[in-house]
Amino acid sequence: MSAWAPPQASPALLAVLAASCLGTAVWEEIAFRRLAMEAVAGALEEGRTRRLMAACVCSAVFTMLHLPEMGAALPAALRAVQVFLFALAMAGLVEQTGRLAPAIAAHALYDAICFAPAVLGISGSVWEISASSLMAPETSMSGMLASLLFLAPAAALGVRRLLAAR
């Protein structure tokens, strides 16, 4: 029995993965956490929950755009919760720091963790990507639940920051 060795990825493949994760993070954070969030917040009545309501609206749209067609109801529902929690966490991070750069870095890192195993040909793990869509990285129930456990406290902190906002 030989020892497991990670698959070898070409530098070009790793560069494409990095550029894709970073480019997606930059575009989505600007679009959702800066432009859309400010537009929705500006349209809402002043008040303690204005920023949180704007974040929830933008997070719902973000979630809808990230849901692939999925057959089973439970994985689809968990994926929706996962994406929504991620979006709230990013909104809270932007609110806390006043900058997009930390959210862009966190978003790019999260995407890299989700997509690198599939790009590198690693399968059979909690990160295995379904054959039907690259938009659903956590196809195993344990991977999905682990991701939700990681995202829930970050989203709760995001909500707290949004409620404390201007």
Regions inferred by a protein language model and the residue ranges of each:
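Membrane-interface helix caps and helix-loop-helix hairpins in membrane proteins
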Residues: 2-8, 67-76
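Helix-boundary and loop/linker segments of multi-pass membrane transporters
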Residues: 5-14, 44-48
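Membrane-embedded alpha-helical segments of multi-pass membrane proteins
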Residues: 11-19, 27, 31, 80-88, ...
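Small-polar-interrupted transmembrane alpha-helices in polytopic inner-membrane proteins
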Residues: 21, 51-67
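Active-site His/Glu-centered metal-binding helix of metallohydrolases
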Residues: 26-31, 35-36, 40, 64, ...
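Membrane-interface helix/loop boundary segments of multi-pass membrane proteins
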Residues: 27-57, 92-99
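Hydrophobic residues within alpha-helical transmembrane segments
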Residues: 57-64, 77, 81, 105, ...
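C-terminal membrane module of polytopic membrane proteins
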Residues: 108-166
